[in-house]
């Protein structure tokens, strides 16, 4: 049965490209999939700390994780700060990442819960919906909710409010209406004429999911072992992971550059001695004989010697008499070319590409020999992601807020007390 169009027509968003970048360059290990027919990566070579940015949640055998999402720009700023100063304190990191940042926005009440999660690996973040009391028409007021807490189902929330009003557990509600559209959330709770908006809103905070808490459990697999990580631990693990990815990518590119240069060195020698090469091929009984004769003969290298030495590869050696022996790979590459193409190749065409490869090989070797270069590459790639995708914080942090008391849930009324 063919897959539904919602699956076959799905496409990745632009940030996803930075989760998969260089996956084809031996940057991560692969393993068999569930039925052994395909290979799949054990981890994605993400260029930004995706576990913190997107968060994670799940339950396994004997353990659970619940990592909240964070602001991309804030997390990258903290990562860059740790790269610049590996001894940075957790308090300094919290200045960059003060609290989670939820895609649904809403208000984060206080920072103590987030701070505990960042310093100990577990904590609880209090989230409150963004709501205002507005006059919707003359002498009629309503509570207008424009942002709801993370992972709260809007339909369920509206049903709960309606049930509370119907059961008179929360008095003062005349009507609840969902006016949300593609531009955002808008839930309108119309109040009765004699209701006090602040009291009704406080009651809704207490009895509904307009106010909820997110329990942070920062459990992750670190080196294949489950570990409760602090903010410092997450960023340190990511930086170490990116070091490995960049080193493996550079080693792959070095290997490919050397493989190409090996072919080019053989072609350069062949072009320099093109008449003898063509004669050898034509006088051979079959390709196997031609390959053997190309490999056993010492070919004059002449002006190609400096380019061969420039490659800095032990597999390219010039004999003491200035000649060069072709390898089997080089001989096969020469034989794979049509004679017309071989005779048309110019020495400059080959040597120009060799010079370009030599510069790349030198740069790759420098990167692999220098941790500072690797860290510079990691920083630059993080800055590239930040420049393209960082957005302002959605969840506003209310650093100081008063605890809700019983008096906040009671309608204020004028009373007369008669004492006799």
PLM regions and their residue ranges:
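Flexible glycine/proline-rich, aromatic-decorated loop/lid segments
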Residues: 51
